[in-house]
Amino acid sequence: GVADEAQKCGYEQPKVINVGELDEDEAEDLPIVRAQYNAADASYWAVYGSDYFYSKMSGAEKQFYQALYDVNMSFLTGNKSAGYKTFDSARHYHSGFVSIGSLDLDTALEVAKILQMSNPQFYFVNEEMLYGVNSDGKYQLALGVYNTCSNGGARADKTNGIKNKLDSWVASIKSKATILDMEQEAHDIIMRNCWYSEAGSYHQSSAGVLLEGKAVCAGYAETFEMLCNAVGIQTVCVTSSSHEWNKVKLYGRWYAVDCTWDDDKDDKTGTVYGYMYFNVSDNYSDEYSKWSHTAESWWSSYSVPVCENDKVITDRDYNYQGVDYSSVFDVDYYLKTYPDIKAAFGADENQAFMHFINCGMAEGRQGKSSFNVISYKNRYKDLRMAFGNNLRSYYLHYISNGKAEGRKATGDVAITDGVSVYNGVDYSAVYNYSYYIKKYPDIAKAFPNDDISTLAHFVTCGMNEKRQGNMNFDVNSYYNRYADLRSAFGTNWSAYYLHYIQNGKAEGRKGTGTKSI
């Protein structure tokens, strides 16, 4: 209900702790950190994060972000134990200190917050940020780590458990038909497996959802970000002073999603959830949600996506290098039709589109229900004569001319009007494509659905092999019937075909029915 949703603002601002002077062995050593990378594991985990805000940063910000990313990816994929600093009589664990370089401390803290929210696979990171100075007086910063994740062995067990759950959930998401279906399944999985609670050990982290099924808005949003990015749906997290939610890019436009406020469950209602805050605009808000969904002012430096629509618009821009492919491509159709593409790219619209452009057209893949390249090729002899087996050219012709000309692009499963002209000679008097492939299955198998290559075979080989090209001309009969031709051509079989084409038919000579001389 509204009253309950209004209270679901459990995001906690980072606790920034000045730990003073750092020991020499606490200063960063990035070459060593990067050498500890498990490349395969790092590649696996990278897909759960987002580089959207990273792409908006300055060079110095990117340098610090990358160093902090490397330290935490090493911590995630390795089994070293966390470092710690003692402050106020308590140990504060961290994943490793990194120099902030030329950045001021406030900017470095903003970058660190973005890194944590953009990489929820770093589930071990808590709400603390530690900073200190090295012997040169330069600032170093580290992300805090939950006490229960500080031991390398115990953390490895947690990581493995999270990986197994993510693999299962992502497989369920990828099994859905369309991009919107996949996004909704990511939303619903969280609804089915998590309860809003501030009592969990990891309630500010994706680990709250993945390990305990208990989290606040930060855990909901960061888990949704993980699941969507894993299947190729670009998703980021954004915060107000006390709330965290998502922005999702679908069909080229951004939409706001708030899984936390869609979750209406309490101890009595079980699995009740809705879609009130699912794919809406920034302005979709009531009195209490305006302040909850207003991004903190510091986000303005990083181009937070703007969400303008309250309903998903599935028509997107399929322009690439000056060509509009929308008449031959729809991403949902492509992913639904080809499981191998979906397995490779999930719901990543851009990768699926680029596959279609770079590979799919050449392979003859169907990108939209209203255009089948084989049907288009089968139906139009003029195009086959122009393009042959260059399948890509048929798509481009339909885009540039065919659709406007009203040409039909579906429904023709076979060639019904095969070409009969080869090197300027019309062989229709002695050849018919449909007859030839029906009579000679070996030819049909050698040149499937290819009337041009089939005619070429007839001209260069078939005539010499005395193959019959249509029902009106049998070279054996023509040979048997006409002594003048036998005297002129002997066993030069192709000459009989050419004679009939050039003279015999016009002279009224008969091309069938004579079984012997």
Task: Name each region found by the language model.
Residues G1-A177, K290-G322:
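N-terminal accessory/pre-domain segments preceding catalytic cores
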Residues S99, M191-S201, E212-G213, D262, ...:
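Repeated polar recognition positions within modular binding domains
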Residues D104, S206-Y220:
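A short, highly charged nucleic-acid-interacting micro-segment common to nuclease
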Residues A154-V209:
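Secondary-structure boundary elements
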Residues D188-E198, A218-N229:
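Secreted/periplasmic proteins that engage bacterial cell-wall peptidoglycan
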Residues S197-A207, K214, T235-S242:
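Catalytic cysteine-centered active-site loop
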Residues G219-D286:
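Hydrophobic/aromatic-rich core segments of domains that either
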Residues Y320-I517:
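Charge-rich, low-complexity intrinsically disordered regions
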